[in-house]
């Protein structure tokens, strides 16, 4: 889990030798042994909070639109005080390939949102832009009403943390499960090693893993690695008096898993958020989460509201129960898996 704080600047938790592009230069982070790590971007872990069960009488969104803004407007909600993240008319290209073409939407407090659509339509790209790993070529990203320019380290925005769980678990191969889950606490907190070790054990138990603390990632199955990454997203410094709310972004959390393992991960995502408390039973910080997925089971089990990305635009949005009954031809084809329709490969 890569958890990025909007409140200050330090290093991100990235796999060894992974490069990311800033707005003006390319930076490279190489992760050596734990004691030698240099932080440039603040990375933080915390408990993620429950989604909101939205109304069953939500307005249907069956017409094609150029942007994704407006779900709450359609429902008559004019107050934006509960908006945590907003993307306004976001564009992004890589070379000659235009990935995002004017994407707009809002993530509100307490929501569980799914981003779906065919491969190559910009789902992971918009996730990285929201997390601050990529800067949009055009358009704006607002964090709790404050405009963020460029990458997350370009300016300080307090009041919200944004976590990103990569499609791969992004665990450090040379570190044990205990060291992976408690990584930031060992490096950045004032907690003792015994305190961290106990908290890691409790957090792993909360995601259904016991007795794996001393194992290496290579000794775990794919599903277990996903759960370790989830545990890393839930753990936080319990000695702090104030913990800011967090929005957690999942990039295909069930990719590569069998149906049963997928169900375990989906239910963990939902149940951990629904408890409204952290791994050790203390009150949690209610926020929101967003899941990028291709899996129908994830759509049905883990999210309440859907955004459909196609050719770089949000062409449909609605509630989960509307997905299979939509008259939108693009959504119909995606829902049924038919080869006949607008989506071509």
Curated annotation (Swiss-Prot):
The keyword Transit peptide applies. The keyword Transferase does not apply. InterPro entries: AAA+_ATPase, ABC_transporter-like_ATP-bd, ABC_transporter-like_CS, P-loop_NTPase. ATP binds at residues 117-124. It is found in: Plastid, Chloroplast stroma. SUPFAM superfamilies: P-loop containing nucleoside triphosphate hydrolases (SSF52540). One of its GO terms (cellular component) is nucleus. Residues 1-46 form a transit peptide. Residues 85-336 form the ABC transporter domain. Belongs to the ABC transporter superfamily. ABCI family. PANTHER family: PROTEIN TRIGALACTOSYLDIACYLGLYCEROL 3, CHLOROPLASTIC (PTHR43023:SF3). Catalytic subunit of the TGD complex, a lipid translocator at the inner chloroplast envelope membrane made of TGD1, TGD2 and TGD3. Interacts with TGD1 and TGD2 with an overall subunit stoichiometry of 2 TGD1, 2 TGD3 and 8 to 12 TGD2. Interacts with TGD5. This is Protein TRIGALACTOSYLDIACYLGLYCEROL 3, chloroplastic. It comes from Arabidopsis thaliana (Mouse-ear cress).
């Amino acid at each position: 889990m890569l958890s990025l704080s909007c409140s200050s600047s330090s290093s991100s938790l990235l796999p060894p030798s992974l490069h990311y592009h800033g707005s003006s230069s390319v930076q490279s982070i190489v992760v050596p042994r734990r004691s030698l790590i240099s932080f440039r971007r603040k990375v933080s872990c915390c408990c993620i909070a429950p989604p909101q069960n939205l109304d069953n009488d939500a307005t249907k969104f069956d017409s094609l639109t150029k942007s994704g803004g407006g779900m709450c407007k359609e429902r008559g909600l004019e107050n934006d005080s509960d908006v945590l993240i907003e993307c306004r008319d976001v564009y992004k290209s890589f070379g000659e390939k235009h990935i995002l073409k004017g994407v707009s939407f809002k993530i509100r407090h307490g929501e569980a949102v799914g981003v779906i659509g065919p491969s190559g339509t910009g789902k992971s790209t918009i996730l990285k832009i929201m997390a601050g790993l990529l800067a949009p070529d055009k358009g704006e990203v607002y964090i709790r009403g404050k405009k963020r320019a460029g990458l997350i380290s370009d300016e300080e925005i307090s009041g919200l943390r944004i976590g990103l769980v990569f499609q791969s678990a992004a665990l450090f191969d040379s570190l044990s499960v205990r060291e992976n889950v408690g990584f930031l606490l060992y490096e950045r907190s004032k907690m003792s090693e015994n305190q961290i070790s106990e908290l890691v054990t409790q957090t792993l138990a909360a995601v259904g893993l016991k007795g794996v603390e001393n194992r290496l990632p290579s000794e775990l199955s794919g599903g277990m690695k996903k759960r370790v990454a989830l545990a890393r997203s839930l753990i936080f410094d319990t000695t702090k008096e104030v913990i800011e709310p967090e929005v957690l972004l999942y990039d295909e959390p069930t990719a590569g898993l069998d149906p049963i393992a997928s169900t375990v991960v989906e239910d963990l995502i939902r149940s951990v958020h629904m408890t409204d408390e952290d791994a050790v039973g203390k009150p949690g910080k209610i926020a929101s989460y967003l899941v990028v997925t291709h899996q129908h089971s994830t759509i049905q089990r883990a999210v309440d509201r859907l955004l459909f990305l196609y050719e770089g635009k949000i062409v449909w949005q609605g509630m989960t129960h509307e997905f299979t009954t939509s008259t939108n031809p693009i959504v119909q084809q995606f829902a049924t898996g038919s080869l006949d329709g607008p989506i071509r490969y």
